[in-house]
Each structure stands twice: as C-alpha cells, then as structure tokens.
Amino acid sequence: MYPVDLHMHTVASTHAYSTLHDYIVEAQQKNIRLFAITDHGPDMADAPHYWHFMNMRVWPRLVDGVGILRGIEANIKNIEGDIDCTGPMLDQVDVIIAGFHEPVFPPQDKDTHTAAMIATMARGDAHIISHPGNPKFPVDIRAIAEAAAKYNVALELNNSSFIHSRQGSEPNCRAIAEAVRDAGGLLSLGSDSHIAFSLGDFTHCERILQEVNFPQDRILNVSPRRVLDFLEQRGMPAIAELADL
C-alpha cells in the first residue's frame, strides 16, 4: 500500500459522503501518512463555494500523525487551458489537480482535448492532471505524456476509473502509464474517494503499474517526502509542519 492519497472528495462536494474528520480516522487505520482533500472547483454545479477554498487556512496541517494537504480538483474550462482556480485561491491551496468534467467542458474531439490539456499544463498552475484516461475525452496519449514530462506535471492513475466511474478507462490508463514511463514523467495515484472507506485504495492502479513495470521512483505516492519535494520543486512554499512526515 502507498502511504499517500492525492485525490478525494468530502461532503463539501455534495455528491460525496465523508468529512475531513472521517478521512483522518480512516487514514490512521490504514497507515496513510498524508492525503490531499481535492474537492471540485467552483464551476461544477455541486462544488463548494469559493469561500470554502479561501478558508482552508483554518485546517490543521497535522492531526495525530496524519498530514493534510489543502487541494482542489479544478476544472479545465476551455482550449486555452484556463481552470477555475485563479487569483487569491492559488495562494490557499497546496496541490492543484485539473481535469475534464462534462458539465464544465462538454466532450469534443481528440485534437481539442489534447490541446486543452497541454495548454493547462503549460500555464503552470496545475500539478496533476486527473483521470486523463477518461474515454469520453480521448487525447493523444503520447503527446500528453511528453508534455507532462516537459512541464513537470504528474498524470494520474485514478482507481475509481476502473470500478465506479468513467467505464472503459482501463486500456487508456495502461497506455498512459506506458507513455509516461517512456517519456520519463511522473504518475500520481488517486483513489478519487467519495466516501472515506475508499481512502488509499489503489488496487487497480497497482495492477497496471506492475503490468507495465513502472519505476517506483517516479510515482509521487511512494512517500510524503516525495510529494512535498515535488510541490516545492513546482514553486510551492515548504510546509514546516509536515517536514518530519
């Protein structure tokens, strides 16, 4: 099991069912040392209000040995790569995941999806691209992997894509893992948990990683320190409270 989960949702996204406290308890039981709460960006219909993200500064950084990252799953809005995490919000989050969601960016064609995803990476705010294997948003996988390596953005293997949502993702996810491996890029693992019991469940992601012989040192989730070093390399300030995780 990997000790870090970088994608999950709380009741602040109203189609999810657990609180921050629920996740802390589950993390302690599963020996998860660091997780990121990444509720949906405000352009989604049931997303938290802008104030939710602006007030995340009240969250503790460390609770009973479990580190907490303040995150967002932002929406890619257009072919120019705009996302719905801008201005003062950028100063309140530690980790920015960005991805396509149908209510914000209706599926179009492969070239448009590829251009929008690469533009998002090039803009420099997103650290991770969420569920890039979604078959409703086909992309040029090789081009995406090469751009991610160029811009130091991690592509996500999303465990939920194999079991609950985005059915038909598995062939794309395998191809993405292979392409990222060959491009020298990074992968991020996300449970995409919408209820605390799913925290840290990477069962299907781990199977893909083994099948393609993906290098462990290029998976962010191998340790809290690996994640924190990556975020600092990307220009985020060091988080003193998490230094000893």
UniProtKB/Swiss-Prot annotation:
Q: Binding of Zn(2+) 3: at which residues?
A: E73, H101, H131
Q: EC number(s) on record?
A: 3.1.3.-
A UniProt-annotated Pfam family:
PHP
Q: InterPro entries from the xrefs?
A: Phosphatase_YcdX_put (IPR023710), PHP_dom (IPR004013), PHP_phosphatase (IPR050243), Pol/His_phosphatase_N (IPR003141), Pol/histidinol_Pase-like (IPR016195)
Q: Does the keyword Zinc apply?
A: yes
Q: How is the cofactor bound?
A: Binds 3 Zn(2+) ions per subunit.
**Binding-site positions, Zn(2+) 2:** H15, H40, H194
GO biological-process terms attached to the record: bacterial-type flagellum-dependent swarming motility
Tell me a GO cellular component: cytosol
Gene Ontology molecular function terms on file: phosphatase activity; zinc ion binding
Tagged with keyword Zinc:
yes
Keyword entries, A-Z: Hydrolase, Metal-binding, Zinc
Q: SMART domains given for it?
A: POLIIIAc
Q: Which residues bind Zn(2+) 1?
A: H7, H9, E73, D192
What cofactors are annotated for this protein?
Answer: Zn(2+)
| Complexes and interactors | Homotrimer.
State the similarity comment: Belongs to the PHP family.
Q: What is this protein called?
A: Probable phosphatase ECA2529
